């Protein structure tokens, strides 16, 4: 853990470490935290519309000091948005990725299904998971329902496009026991 000095300017705050001469830039807009640029070994540029999680970074604000701790930066982004939801794609043949403002999903077919991402939502993907952040719960639910309509989920096997908050596995009824003589 290192303590960093804060150098204030008009729109951005520059943080300089005393040991290493590296800069970190944060940008505050309407009392919201937005990460603008991080320079460690290379340069990484983030704008308001992009959403990227960086491992092992988290900050808490003190008077003229910011302390970095070993946690994920996902909590940094959750402060901007009120609602969050996660979709799991369980089964064979599921692939997803984001290209520009479109979400591409392969659901066991030979063609990708393309969804246009609304401006009010932020979406990022892992292997078989889609994370959706937004300002209203209705917009998130509408976008998730469009994705769920693509492939009908099988509740008995637990496969398909699932949201685990509302999902419950249904158990099959046990058959009659056979007698052996």
UniProtKB/Swiss-Prot annotation:
| One record GO biological process | translation
Q: Does the keyword Ribosomal protein apply?
A: yes
Gene Ontology CC annotations of this record: mitochondrion; ribonucleoprotein complex; ribosome
Q: Which UniProt keywords apply?
A: Mitochondrion, Ribonucleoprotein, Ribosomal protein
Specify the superkingdom. Answer: Eukaryota
- Record-level Gene Ontology MF annotations: rRNA binding; structural constituent of ribosome
InterPro entries in UniProt: Ribosomal_uL6-like, Ribosomal_uL6-like_a/b-dom_sf, Ribosomal_uL6_CS
Where is the protein localized?
Mitochondrion
Q: Which family does it belong to?
A: Belongs to the universal ribosomal protein uL6 family.
Protein name per Swiss-Prot or TrEMBL: Large ribosomal subunit protein uL6m
Q: Which organism is it from?
A: Acanthamoeba castellanii
């Amino acid at each position: 853990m290192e303590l960093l000095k804060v150098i204030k300017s008009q729109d951005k705050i520059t943080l300089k470490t005393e040991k290493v001469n590296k800069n970190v830039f944060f940008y505050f807009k309407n009392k919201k935290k937005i990460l603008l640029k991080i320079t460690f070994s290379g340069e990484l540029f983030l704008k308001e519309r992009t959403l990227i999680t960086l491992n092992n970074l988290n900050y808490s604000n003190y008077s003229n000091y910011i302390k970095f701790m070993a946690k994920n930066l996902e909590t940094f982004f959750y402060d901007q948005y009120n609602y969050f939801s996660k979709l799991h794609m369980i089964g064979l043949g599921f692939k997803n990725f984001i290209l520009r403002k479109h979400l591409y999903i392969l659901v066991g077919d030979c063609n990708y299904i393309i969804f246009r991402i609304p401006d009010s939502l932020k979406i990022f993907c892992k292997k078989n998971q889609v994370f959706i952040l937004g300002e209203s719960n209705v917009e998130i639910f509408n976008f998730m329902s469009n994705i769920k309509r693509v492939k009908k989920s099988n509740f008995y096997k637990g496969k398909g496009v699932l949201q685990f908050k509302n999902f419950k596995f249904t158990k099959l009824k046990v058959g009659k026991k056979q007698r052996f003589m």
